[in-house]
Amino acid sequence: MTKAIIKPSLAANYEAERAKGALCFPYYAQPKIDGVRVLVTLSEGEVVLYSRNGNKLSLPHLSAALTPYLTSRPGLILDGELYSRDLSFTALCSAIRSSEHHDKQMVSLYLFDCYNPNRPRQAYKDRYKALYDLSGVPFIEVVESLTVKSHRAVERALEHFIGLGYEGVMIKSISSPYKQGRSKAMMKYKKFLDSEFEVVATDATTITCYTPSGVPFSVKGRAKLGEIVTIRYQEITPNGSLRFPRLVASRDYE
């Protein structure tokens, strides 16, 4: 890890902070993305992506897309997640790791923050605005941000982002400077259940299981026929199906 890279901000638990009476509205609410965290900066004239642990990642299409922006902003560090709506988390990680993976250009960078070492006390609302100039850049997404002024508004934001296929909501302090490490300046909030199911059918990209009431459902991912897998979902609907199911792991993974 180089001197240019900071420790990424990490999220506290929203429900725990709410139970302590530690919330201070308003906040920004943003989608919780199930991707790979990265910090991005310009190093010796080249755009470099670093993992959360400081390892360099090679995604040339993203480096090229960010070169004009970061060249004009020396020292700036972008904070976001590598993510693809069309790849499972396992396939996403494989595409990121492999130098020649055919799915590599399916990976986009979802940005939600930045850090300017020349303005270490800069409020989040201003850091977020600094990302606007990246709107419309290929392979780059600036996450949607909603202003929430109550817990009820947080619940509505959670439903909104889950409805878009995300796994939850991130709650950000509007006025806080960038906090390295874990702090309540950023909180995560999601409502999901985990259950085990037997795989009854498979194809190249999906697996199929049955709910306890006998309703079939399919999710993206790969597993063996008859294998027991862990599925994460929001709730069981009145007709017995799962809302927003997602493959988490198989027993082989454990």
Predicted regions: what they are:
Residues 1-23:
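Phosphate/adenylate-binding "loop-and-lid" substructures adjacent to NTP/NAD/dNTP-binding pockets
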Residues 3, 145-193:
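Amphipathic alpha-helical
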Residues 7, 27, 78, 168-172:
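A short, Trp-centered hydrophobic/proline-enriched beta-strand micro-motif
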Residues 11-17, 90-94, 149-155:
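Short, motif-level signal for alpha-helix interfacial/capping segments enriched in acidic residues
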Residues 80-82, 111-116, 144-147, 173-175, ...:
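Short, structured patches in soluble enzyme cores that scaffold and shape functional sites
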